[in-house]
Amino acid sequence: MVAPAVSTRAVLAALALLAAGFGEGPPDPAGYRNPCPATGSAVAVFSRTHELYLCREGVPHARIRVALGRGGMGKRRAGDKKTPVGSYSFGEPRASARYGTFIPIDYPTAEQTALGYTGRDLGIHGPPRNWKDVAAATALDWTTGCIATGTDEEVERVARFVRDERPLAIIE
């Protein structure tokens, strides 16, 4: 059997890929970074990708697609329909007639209040009770500043995590 001819160019390209670390398992996607802080528990929300991660000791345990405030990010005043950015503690998850389960986020922080930020009743919840097409719950940003999961099961999973872990909310 005759070995197929391989061009010098192909060999050099293969060597360059090996030298760059390819071929040693799957490469990380360009720009990948671990979404979780190295220690502790956190619910990390990334506005750019519309993803929420449940994190424990630097390891993501769940990834959930979310919708955000229709006014964008960077809440500063009540009624601006923006989702706040920063680190927050959680209140106790509770039943909600409108959303099933509501997980309060302690916004604004004392520092934000000192800077004049206003707003209240922000948190994580599922789709509204009256929506027929829950698949649309994360298709676009529709909330008045909250973070919305696509299903009741997802918000319940977040609520259990908040009750069990007492995590920090990190929103960016």
For each predicted feature, which ranges?
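N-terminal post-signal-peptidase region of extra-cytosolic proteins
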Residues: P27-A42, L68-E92, F102, D106, ...
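Exported/periplasmic cell-wall-interacting domains
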Residues: T39, K82, E92-E172
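Bacterial N-terminal signal peptides that target proteins for export
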Residues: M1-V11
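Short Gly/aromatic-enriched secondary-structure transition segments
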Residues: V59-G71
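Short, surface-exposed binding/anchoring microloops in extracellular/periplasmic proteins
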Residues: V45
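Bacterial Sec-dependent signal peptides at the C-terminal "C-region" and cleavage site
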Residues: A10-R33
